[in-house]
């Protein structure tokens, strides 16, 4: 069965229950040396799956529908999440921004690869299907399916960190390549990284990132959609923070790890048949190379990414304030200044999301794209911001992050709880249970394995740091902004020379220059 076949009503997206059922398809997921029978019930994945299901359920709640949903443009007569339909104006983008934010608040910004992330790919297919040449109709069909059902896509576009100094066609034993062409489709083998949360998705888009060297063998120049239950598709998962949290603690100890862990996995394809209707680019280096700049996804996904980070920083800012109140340092001038800096970082990303929408630019077929300069700024600044904010938290909360008991179980032991009540209480009348709860939440956010992974995630979210900054420079050059800035400097320098001012409205200093008088 296809995911859309689980819907009781074809005019609406999946519900949470239908989403969970659609994952029970025999997909080949491995963790801790064993194959997972059902990701919706396995302790390594079940709470993350339930958290995504909650997002699907929100699409059908009357009090959230106005913010989250609007009608489809496919002729189905149904409705969908706003970011699953192509924006046709700046106001459409603003409404999409608000829908993204509302959905993200369900995970407090801690789930990044939610269904709306790759909805940007679906919209790119729908807005510019002609880019895919002979596979134009495939692009149109996928846009319709993604939009009407709310299909959960991920992508795997980065090659494994093996021999990256070589072109793809010189690492044939590792990177995904064409094995064989058949009447039914293409057969592919190889691996990709990192397939974040793919264990809980319906499909993976396989392609190339912008910073990778492709080589000359067209058997590597592919882009296609792989169902997660396709024979030969395998995910080898990293350790599950959710499962570790459940096995060694409780929600009180690990309130984020235990429900929002988007497991990153090694994606292996072992002679996988990809039907022709799932192929988007086939043995076409030129189109693969142009996809990043012309395909549209790279211009669309940063809106979701920026808004999701802004929501996350709302949460972190408030949690930092609570943590400082625990320790009694929240009124110190220097501490308040650091908290103010975190607020400024938070404000910047909300402002960038505003700019992406208000300065939106027309694209093809009536579609609108987020402002390019704003999204490039987000991509450059986000890694800097996250690392700086984490450092501010560590410098200001200090030992409060680890001056904590091992587990909620300690609170149930009267022999030690009496000491915890006295020596681990909060400031200004806060009891020890509340203080420990707040600071364990902060530790899970930045200090646990889950928290450390999130720092790595935010720093590398948009790919190579050099490439991200180079793209920002290229955008300034291609848009003409660099020429305008250069022209301003040239105009300034043209207004004077070694003899004085060259413009008529300024007065030369020959009448007051002391050196002229002294050296006569």
Question: Where are the model-predicted features located?
Answer:
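Alpha-helix capping/hinge segments and adjacent helical runs
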Residues: 373-516
């Amino acid at each position: 069965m296809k995911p859309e076949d689980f819907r009781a009503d074809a005019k609406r997206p999946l519900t949470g229950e239908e989403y969970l059922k659609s994952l029970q398809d025999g997909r080949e997921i491995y963790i801790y040396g064993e194959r997972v029978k059902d990701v919706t019930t396995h302790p390594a994945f079940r709470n993350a799956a339930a958290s995504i299901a909650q997002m699907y359920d929100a699409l059908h709640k009357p009090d959230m529908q106005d913010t989250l949903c609007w009608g489809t443009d496919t002729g189905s007569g149904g409705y969908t999440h706003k970011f699953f339909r192509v924006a046709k104006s700046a106001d459409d983008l603003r409404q999409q921004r608000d829908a993204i934010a509302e959905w993200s608040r369900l995970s407090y910004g801690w789930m990044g690869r939610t269904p709306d992330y790759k909805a940007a790919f679906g919209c790119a297919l729908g807005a510019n299907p002609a880019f895919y040449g002979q596979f134009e109709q495939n692009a149109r069909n996928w846009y319709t399916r993604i939009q009407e059902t709310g299909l959960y896509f991920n992508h795997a576009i980065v090659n494994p960190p093996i021999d990256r100094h070589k072109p793809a066609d010189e690492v044939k034993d590792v990177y995904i390549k064409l094995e064989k062409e058949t009447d039914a489709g293409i057969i592919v083998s190889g691996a990709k990284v990192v397939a974040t949360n793919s264990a809980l998705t319906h499909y993976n888009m396989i392609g190339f990132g912008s910073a990778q060297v492709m080589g000359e063998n067209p058997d590597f120049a592919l882009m296609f959609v792989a169902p997660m239950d396709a024979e030969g598709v395998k995910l080898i998962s990293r350790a599950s923070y959710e499962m570790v949290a459940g096995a060694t603690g409780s929600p009180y100890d690990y309130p984020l790890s235990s429900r929002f862990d988007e497991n990153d996995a090694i994606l292996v394809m072992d002679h996988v048949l990809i039907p022709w209707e799932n192929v988007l680019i086939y043995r076409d280096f030129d189109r693969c190379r142009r996809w990043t700049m012309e395909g549209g996804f790279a211009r669309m996904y940063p809106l979701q990414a920026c808004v999701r980070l802004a929501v996350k920083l709302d949460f972190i800012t408030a949690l930092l304030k609570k943590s400082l109140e625990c320790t009694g340092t929240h009124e110190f001038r220097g501490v308040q200044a650091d908290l103010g800096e975190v607020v400024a970082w938070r404000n910047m990303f909300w402002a960038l999301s505003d700019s992406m929408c208000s300065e939106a630019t027309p694209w093809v077929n009536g579609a609108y794209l987020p402002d390019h300069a704003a999204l490039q700024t987000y991509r450059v600044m986000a890694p800097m911001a996250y690392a700086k904010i984490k450092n501010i938290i560590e410098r200001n909360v200090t030992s409060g992050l680890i001056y904590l008991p091992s587990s909620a179980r300690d609170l149930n032991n009267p022999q030690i709880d009496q000491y915890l009540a006295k020596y681990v209480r909060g400031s200004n009348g806060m009891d020890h249970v509340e203080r420990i709860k707040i600071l364990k939440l902060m530790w899970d956010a930045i200090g646990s394995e889950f928290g450390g992974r999130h720092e790595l995630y935010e720093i590398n979210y948009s790919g190579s740091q050099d490439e991200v900054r180079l793209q920002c420079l290229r955008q300034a050059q291609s848009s003409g902004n660099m020429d305008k800035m250069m022209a301003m400097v040239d105009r300034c320098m043209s207004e004077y020379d070694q003899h004085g001012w060259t413009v008529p409205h300024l007065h030369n200093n020959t009448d007051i220059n002391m050196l002229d008088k002294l050296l006569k």
